[in-house]
């Protein structure tokens, strides 16, 4: 007996098979969305599958955001960042759903702890502690920070360390991506507690010269670098002294040389002899 092929029956079988594809779960990629700029977009790929892991091609998928103030999602699964915060995108097909967490971290400001800075003493140092925060006020732990000095002759920068080089004021800029934060830095000298002559010739002959060495000391007895001194002589007819502390013998006699620095002073006597 001859069997006849019935195309209507075949079509019914195909439709029945498709209708029997039950959605067991929804696979979402990426599993987590991370956004770092307002308006940044990431497209979610969602696929409904059966218990056997077979794709349900014509399954209807609906996307929804748990917080549209943080991130929105359109009907195709495109997620857009709005502001910093946490949200979740839910993909639903019938009674089955899946969630993809969304973390939006938009760097908004740099906070420098302890600013403005004052460095006391040449060579003194301070380590800068700065933090990048997003527009929700949360720390951005992955942010990288760089520092630069407007005047390296006053303050040098090594990594996050500031080093005093000369008396004065400058600015140090902390940078992270497009964010910048300037902080003023002042370098000053410690308070001078005493001034003393270190090198003084016992005598000078007329026509000879000598450099006087003077040191300023702090309350701890340590020498202070960078102190400027003013020199004077009690009698220029016997010996002169210039701004650098160079003494020149003029004629025989006794003279007093005075050095002043940081509101403190010291004196030393010098004898000038004939040639």
Residue positions per predicted region:
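Sec-dependent bacterial lipoprotein signal peptides
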Residues: 1-18
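Extracytoplasmic soluble-region selector
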Residues: 3, 20-275
